[in-house]
Amino acid sequence: MAAGEEAPSILLPAVYDIVWSAVVFVVLLVVIWKYALPRVYAMLDGRTEAIAGGIEKAERAQAEADAAKAELTAQLVEARAEAGRIREQARVDASVIAAEIKEQATADAARITASGTQQIEAERQQAVVSLRSEVGSLAIDLASGVIGQSLADDQRSTALVDRFLADLEASETAGRTGSAS
């Protein structure tokens, strides 16, 4: 080695290496800056817009879901209130119908009782009339046989039978009143 030349340093590279390395670094920096970086920024902007759009869409969907939930809650409250009104109206209607049916049944029972009473009274009157005529005929026949004369006069025999039956009824009524006391 010559005295004027120095030995290359291990830590410090040669000047031409530094210059060429700086030129290549600047060229790569310009290429990245000019071509790659705009594409990366465009891709990042697209992703940012997509994420922001997704967040906005999710917020709108959440707002719609909250509105739908509030509407459904209101409808549920209204439906429960309507069901309560319907139940109450059904109770009122049932009590009205039950009262009407009870009133109708009472009226029907009274009508049937009155009809039965009238029918029994009519049959009793018919039986009394029938028995009077038969008893009268038998009494006249019996009296005719006992006294040996004919009691053919209808008016006189009818009056006799009626008087006899009236006396019989009066004695029966007196007997009932006396035994009841």
From Swiss-Prot:
Name the predominant localization: membrane
Question: SUPFAM superfamilies, per this entry?
Answer: F1F0 ATP synthase subunit B, membrane domain (SSF81573)
Where are the membrane-spanning stretches?
12-32
Pfam families to which the protein is assigned, alphabetical = ATP-synt_B
> Which GO terms of the cellular component aspect does the record hold?
plasma membrane; proton-transporting ATP synthase complex
* Location within or outside the cell: Cell membrane
Subunit details: F-type ATPases have 2 components, F(1) - the catalytic core - and F(0) - the membrane proton channel. F(1) has five subunits: alpha(3), beta(3), gamma(1), delta(1), epsilon(1). F(0) has three main subunits: a(1), b(2) and c(10-14). The alpha and beta chains form an alternating ring which encloses part of the gamma chain. F(1) is attached to F(0) by a central stalk formed by the gamma and epsilon chains, while a peripheral stalk is formed by the delta and b chains.
Function description: F(1)F(0) ATP synthase produces ATP from ADP in the presence of a proton or sodium gradient. F-type ATPases consist of two structural domains, F(1) containing the extramembraneous catalytic core and F(0) containing the membrane proton channel, linked together by a central stalk and a peripheral stalk. During catalysis, ATP synthesis in the catalytic domain of F(1) is coupled via a rotary mechanism of the central stalk subunits to proton translocation.
What family does the entry list? Belongs to the ATPase B chain family.
NCBIfam families recorded for this chain? ATP_synt_b, PRK05759.1-3
Q: What is this protein called?
A: ATP synthase subunit b
